[in-house]
Amino acid sequence: MTILKIDEIINPNKQKLTPIKEKQDIIIPDIIDKNIPRRNGSIVVFTGSGGSGKTSTLLNMFKSKKQYRGIFDNIYYFCPLASYLSISNHPFKKLENLYHELTVENLENIYNQLISKKEAYEQYLEKKKEKQRNKNKKKPKEQFVEYLDDEQESETEDEDEITEIQYSCIIIDDFANDLKNNDIEKQLNKMLIKARHLCTMFIFTLQSYLYFPKMLRKQITYAIIFKPKSIAEWNSITDELIHYNKEDSLKLFNYIFDEPYSTFGYDTIENKVYKNFNLLKIENN
């Protein structure tokens, strides 16, 4: 069958789409560098062979005030013990949520913590609305004393109460073999689907893009790729992410990886391509 012509019949009753305002931000607040992943619920992968610079780049981003330093309320860091001990003066050495094993139990516990934090914030908002509704019902003159009491009461908050959105980040550093475990993959998939609603960014580091399970790759929002070991691997990456043919893929490879530690970045939401976090403007025929 060959399509000759397509006609569209307009629905006269069609409603205009109005985006629903959500409580969480689309962009995580206070990140100055606009060329790094900033979207709430980002699923980020850093890939590169051993010694490529991926872990150094990631850790430096959490040390930079223009990037991720001081941005997240909660950081959960998974890193094999040997890899962790190999880094002198590790930036996450004082981190409370530090894990050396990637298990379903650990992931499930974190997932439940994140849900509890979100529910606590929702309860705070509801309580705040309820107080406002009660104030609006009162008559200012007749209930002046009670109104003042309410004002004083509203200023007193529980120390443990979550009164602002908490943004979290889960980093899974160099656990490619564990990601092959079906139960771990399913638990992660469950969490990635909810990443935006949980206000959580996920960051994975792997030695190859293809080590990341295909089910999870479908949810990537930002990829940061260090020089692949072969053109065949690079072609697989560009074919899956940006749908380039082999000729254009090779041109991009030669342009980006012209010096050590260069990176290819791709924002899958906005379809933007980066070299070393510099935006590239690519002209096509």
Which residue stretches match the model-derived regions?
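N-terminal pre-Walker A segment at the start of P-loop NTPase domains
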Residues: 1-33, 82
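Conserved P-loop NTPase motor cores
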Residues: 28-33, 41-65, 69-70, 80-84, ...
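An amphipathic, basic-hydrophobic helix/alpha-beta surface used to engage anionic
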Residues: 75
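Short intrinsically disordered coil segments
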Residues: 92, 240, 279-282
